[in-house]
């Protein structure tokens, strides 16, 4: 079963990424039209999905990443702006995010990265904002100075998309129906940057390790 608007390679890149984005932004983050959404890791699969869903929901989408060349692609996916998280080898994005949000900061932060990126995210979140914990691609699980949550009134929200559906089967079905519907309407389009045959599986892993990925890689 796949959305009729996608070919099989695109469909292979669809389910997990877009379900994660939907559970994160709709179910857990309660993202509202007009809010400022900061998407970390925006050039990867789950980030790409969050950018596209954020646009569909009417948010002001700010995409982040470490490569300006890759980040330019996020504008095609619906991002309003993009911001480099690292400058001269140091994490530095919070002032730029505040500038893009009239000094308020992001209302919702979608974070599959963790590490230093999370540490700086708590400095550029709006009062009453929600930080969605999607993963730790940086390799470091961050800790939180809990007084920051009190001072800025923000929430830390964990996201496990698959478990969300297993705990509530009815909502799990509704989530899948929703992402298929949005896709069929033409609002979702997974970007597959490269395809490998099954015999090239080893090469596909090497390609991922070189950090060339934009969107998704598919092994067919």
Question: Would you name each region that the model predicts?
Answer:
Residues 169-220:
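C-terminal hydrophobic helical "lid"/dimerization subdomain
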């Amino acid at each position: 079963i796949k959305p009729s608007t996608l070919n099989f390679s695109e469909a292979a890149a669809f389910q997990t990424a877009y379900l994660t984005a939907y559970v994160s932004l709709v179910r857990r983050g309660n993202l509202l039209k007009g809010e400022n959404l900061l998407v970390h890791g925006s050039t990867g699969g789950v980030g790409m999905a969050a950018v596209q869903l954020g646009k569909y929901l009417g948010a002001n989408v700010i995409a982040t990443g470490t490569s300006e060349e890759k980040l330019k692609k996020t504008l095609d996916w619906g991002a309003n702006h993009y911001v480099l998280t690292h400058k001269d080898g140091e994490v530095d994005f919070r002032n730029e995010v505040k500038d893009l949000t009239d000094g308020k900061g992001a209302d919702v932060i979608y974070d599959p990265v963790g590490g230093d990126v999370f540490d700086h995210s708590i400095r550029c979140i709006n009062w009453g904002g929600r930080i969605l914990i999607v993963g730790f691609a940086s390799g470091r699980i961050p800790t939180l100075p809990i007084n920051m949550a009190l001072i800025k009134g923000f929430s830390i929200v964990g996201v496990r998309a698959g478990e969300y559906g297993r705990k509530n089967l009815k909502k799990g079905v509704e989530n899948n129906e929703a992402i298929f519907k949005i896709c069929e309407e033409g609002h979702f389009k997974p970007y597959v940057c490269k395809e490998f045959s099954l015999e090239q599986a080893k090469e596909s892993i090497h390609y991922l390790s070189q950090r060339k990925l934009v969107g998704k890689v598919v092994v067919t």
